């Protein structure tokens, strides 16, 4: 079902209003006023079924994912810190300070899968536009893209540690023979057996 909206808090007469305890000039507050939140409702509306339980508010989910990536946090960490931070709560569309987590952190992964690459691209596009509008980023800074391939999927044999240890030992033994260095024991056979045992343990997921 289409997302719900955060409670307006009309019945929360004895709770603290966020706009009364935050600095309106704080960067996140100013950014919240620039981001076109309604744009996400329109962009993601087609990803929801017409029936069923109402989904979490789009602004809440978008805001949590923005904070998650800006501060390099896990899903669990961003939800935990959200409860402690009035600026984060205001950014996600709440009017009154909340003392409990707005969602279960486990719901963030299904939401990402639901909006897919197209939705994530929309998030990135809106973030860049907001950064340019607020002066956080300059147009020339977007002319070049730095790509980090350290997490690029590669065909690496597992377990890598035991295999590397074995190769290092074999290389040292070869160099020792090449330079005429006599070793009382090379441990080559023992290392091979240990590597095989490590692979078996890894296959059985026993460590």
UniProtKB/Swiss-Prot annotation:
Query: What organism is recorded for this protein?
Result: Rhizobium meliloti (Ensifer meliloti)
**Keyword vocabulary terms for this entry:** Plasmid
The answer to keyword Lipid metabolism applying to this record is no
Q: Does the record's keyword annotation contain Transmembrane helix?
A: no
Please give the superkingdom of this protein's source. Answer: Bacteria
What is this protein's name? Uncharacterized protein ORF8 in nfe locus
């Amino acid at each position: 079902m289409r997302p719900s909206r955060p409670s307006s808090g009309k019945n929360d007469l004895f709770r603290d209003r966020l706009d009364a305890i935050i600095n309106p000039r704080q960067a996140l507050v100013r950014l919240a006023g620039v981001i076109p939140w309604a744009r996400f409702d329109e962009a993601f509306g087609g990803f929801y079924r017409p029936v069923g339980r109402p989904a979490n508010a789009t602004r809440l989910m978008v805001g949590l994912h923005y904070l998650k990536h800006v501060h390099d946090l896990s899903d669990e960490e961003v939800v935990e810190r959200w409860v402690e931070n009035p600026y984060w709560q205001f950014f996600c569309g709440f009017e009154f300070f909340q003392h409990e987590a707005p969602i279960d952190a486990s719901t963030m992964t299904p939401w990402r899968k639901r909006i897919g690459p197209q939705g994530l691209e929309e998030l990135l596009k809106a973030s860049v536009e907001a950064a340019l509008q607020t002066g956080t980023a300059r147009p020339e800074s977007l002319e070049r893209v730095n790509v980090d391939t350290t997490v690029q999927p590669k065909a690496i044999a597992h377990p890598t540690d035991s295999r590397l240890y074995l190769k290092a030992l074999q290389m040292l033994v070869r160099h020792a023979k090449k330079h005429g260095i006599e070793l009382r024991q090379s441990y080559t056979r023992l290392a091979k057996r240990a590597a095989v045992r490590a692979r078996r343990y890894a296959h059985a997921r026993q460590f």
